[in-house]
């Protein structure tokens, strides 16, 4: 079985491409079914395995398959599914086989491949991806083992290194950028669009600055209300956004919408109503919530996840010692996993050997039972049974020795000696 990871992330592709390759949660299960059946092949009983990890910074396909051409098929499927020409997508895609795929999974879960070094959100997202793949019936022995080892490695890395300490989060970076635009965040009105984990983190950081007003707009009014109350703010219907956008100096958006929810026209009207006082906007969603053309407006300061990445990276350099520790742990665990994978490769052969030997045994026992039933001498029947089993069990190795010659034969002879050197002796004449 071959392990393979195909993907794009914030290292290889801009947000404009990442948002086109992202999978909304409700699409992942049906996508897994087509990915397995159409491009990896129905190789029963060795059914291919697959999982999809899709976040704002990455879209990755984890596969286990016997098809050595799965790499090209996976890239082609990703292209066709999202209707992106292969020539446009392929230069941004990485394909990681075997140990590289294992190492990548360990690094991703440990926060080493994140824009925010050591961040923990990705681990939860990976667990969600595994849960979804399990519900879709897409996981099997190999990916199950890979992900269980992945979660164990992430726990070890976070528990024995300082990889996650003093990290500059995306939420903290958003506050830092706002402080570059406004002298005091405390004097500003802040609007959060969405009520997920990222918005909750941003609200925590902005609330610490004591803004003049804090408002949450969300499709689900009850959830938005609960989040607003936590930070002493208030909620408003998302439908009020076009008519009330001008009230806010800072707007942070992160929803699961597949289409922009803030268009150029709405922002132009808001800027005009504000008499060209600046608006600071942060779009943390992928796909983006705010049309990119908004960033061209003179009085709008629009930042995406990629823009915030530059600030985040400033805080990453100081933790390189922890990175080295984490990489060493991961390398050891990769080797351990590959050893397990190697042992799995012989399981089908061993199973086949057992099946063949058992078939021979049953056939000879059946013959012996018939001979005993007709009254043949039991001792003679047992002798014939043992002789027949011996001859048939060594027929394969004997034939193999007779078929080869030269160096191949010498190697096979050494191998056979190793097989039989510990054979028990029923009549030891050594005198010991």
UniProtKB/Swiss-Prot annotation:
Sites where the protein binds substrate: 55-58, 114, 119-121, 125
Name of one Pfam family that matches: GlutR_dimer
Positions of NADP(+) binding: 194-199
Reactions accelerated catalytically: (S)-4-amino-5-oxopentanoate + tRNA(Glu) + NADP(+) = L-glutamyl-tRNA(Glu) + NADPH + H(+)
Top-level enzyme category: oxidoreductase
Any single biological process term in GO: protoporphyrinogen IX biosynthetic process from glutamate
PROSITE patterns: GLUTR
Family: Belongs to the glutamyl-tRNA reductase family.
Further information: During catalysis, the active site Cys acts as a nucleophile attacking the alpha-carbonyl group of tRNA-bound glutamate with the formation of a thioester intermediate between enzyme and glutamate, and the concomitant release of tRNA(Glu). The thioester intermediate is finally reduced by direct hydride transfer from NADPH, to form the product GSA.
Domain comment quoted from the record: Possesses an unusual extended V-shaped dimeric structure with each monomer consisting of three distinct domains arranged along a curved 'spinal' alpha-helix. The N-terminal catalytic domain specifically recognizes the glutamate moiety of the substrate. The second domain is the NADPH-binding domain, and the third C-terminal domain is responsible for dimerization.
Protein name in UniProt: Glutamyl-tRNA reductase
Organism: Burkholderia vietnamiensis (strain G4 / LMG 22486) (Burkholderia cepacia (strain R1808))
Gene symbol of the encoding locus: hemA
């Amino acid at each position: 079985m071959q392990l393979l990871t195909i993907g794009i992330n914030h290292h290889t592709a801009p947000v404009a491409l990442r948002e086109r390759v992202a999978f909304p949660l409700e699409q992942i299960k049906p996508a897994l079914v087509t990915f397995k059946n159409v491009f990896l092949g129905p190789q029963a009983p060795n059914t291919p395995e697959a999982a999809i990890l899709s976040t704002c910074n990455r879209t990755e396909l984890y596969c286990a398959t016997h098809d050595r051409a799965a790499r090209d098929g996976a890239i082609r499927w990703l292209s066709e599914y999202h209707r992106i020409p292969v020539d446009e997508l392929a230069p941004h895609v990485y394909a990681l086989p075997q140990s590289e795929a294992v190492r990548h999974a360990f690094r991703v879960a440990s926060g080493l491949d994140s824009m925010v070094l050591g961040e923990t959100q990705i681990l939860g997202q990976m667990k969600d991806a595994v849960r979804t793949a399990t519900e879709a019936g897409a996981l099997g022995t190999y990916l199950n083992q890979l992900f269980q080892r992945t979660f164990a490695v992430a726990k070890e890395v976070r528990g024995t290194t300082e990889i996650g300490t003093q990290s500059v989060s995306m939420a903290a970076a958003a506050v830092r950028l706002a402080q570059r635009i406004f002298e005091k965040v405390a004097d500003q009105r802040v609007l959060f669009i969405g009520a997920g984990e990222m918005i909750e983190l941003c609200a925590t950081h902005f609330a610490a600055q004591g803004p003049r007003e804090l408002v949450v707009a969300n499709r689900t009014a009850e959830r938005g209300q609960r989040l607003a109350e936590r930070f002493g703010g208030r909620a408003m219907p998302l439908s009020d956004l076009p008519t009330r956008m001008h009230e806010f100096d800072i707007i942070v958006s992160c929803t699961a919408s597949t289409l922009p929810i803030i268009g150029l026209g709405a922002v132009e009207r808001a800027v005009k109503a504000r008499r060209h006082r600046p608006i600071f906007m942060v779009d943390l969603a992928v796909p983006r919530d705010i049309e990119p053309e908004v960033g061209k407006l003179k009085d709008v300061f629009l930042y995406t996840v990629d823009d915030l990445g530059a600030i985040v990276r400033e805080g990453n350099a100081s933790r390189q010692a922890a990175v080295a520790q984490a990489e060493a742990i991961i390398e050891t665990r990769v080797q351990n996993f590959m050893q397990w994978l190697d042992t799995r490769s012989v399981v089908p052969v061993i199973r086949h050997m057992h099946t063949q030997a058992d078939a021979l045994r049953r056939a000879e026992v059946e013959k012996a039972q018939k001979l005993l039933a007709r009254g043949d001498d039991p001792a003679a029947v047992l002798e014939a049974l043992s002789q027949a089993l011996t001859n048939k069990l060594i027929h394969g190795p004997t034939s193999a020795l007779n078929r080869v010659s030269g160096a191949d034969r010498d190697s096979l002879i050494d191998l056979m000696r190793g097989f039989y050197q510990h054979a028990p002796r029923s009549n030891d004449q050594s005198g010991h």
